[in-house]
């Protein structure tokens, strides 16, 4: 899961928000119980 979140953060940093949104939706669907720490959430959350 950690690597997936890093990929999503990279998409956000590159301004590819639509792709990041889809990836985050898929991540949450695939890992429903995974708690995203606050620092990571700030990097991956929808904008």
What is each of the regions a protein language model found here?
Residues 17-18, 22-47:
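Short, charge-rich amphipathic alpha-helical segments embedded
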Residues 2-3:
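Alpha-helix N-cap/N′ positions at the starts of helices
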């Amino acid at each position: 899961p950690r690597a997936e979140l890093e990929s999503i953060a990279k998409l956000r940093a590159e301004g590819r928000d639509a792709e990041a949104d889809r990836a985050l939706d898929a991540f949450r669907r695939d890992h429903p119980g995974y708690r995203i720490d606050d620092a990571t959430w700030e990097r991956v959350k929808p904008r």
